C-alpha cells in the first residue's frame, strides 16, 4: 500500500494506519475487479467508493504521485518512484506474465527477447518479491 509524501501530509489520521476509513484510495475499474489488489480494496473499503478508479497501472502510479490517494502498487516500481510504503505485506502477490502470440513464439527475434526477459526476472526474483 503506497502513498506520496504530499498525500500523507494531509491525510486525516497522519500517525494511524490501523484505521483507513477516512483515507482516499485509487482503485481499479470494473474490468479489473479480478485482480488481487482490486479484491483487497473491495474488502478493505467495505462498500465505500474509491476516490478514483483507473484501468491502467500507470494511471494508478500517476494518481498516487499526484497525491490523490493511496493504492496497492508493486514494490519494485513504487520504491523507485519515491513513494512511501504504508503496509508492505497485504497478501496481494501478482504473478508477472510474459505472453507471446503463438504465431510469433518461434520467431528468433521474439525468442531472444523472451529469453532475455525470463533471465532478467529470474536474476531479479528476490528483489521483485521484497517490500
Predicted feature residues:
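C-terminal regulatory
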Residues: 2-96, 123-131
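A late-sequence structural motif
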Residues: 89-127
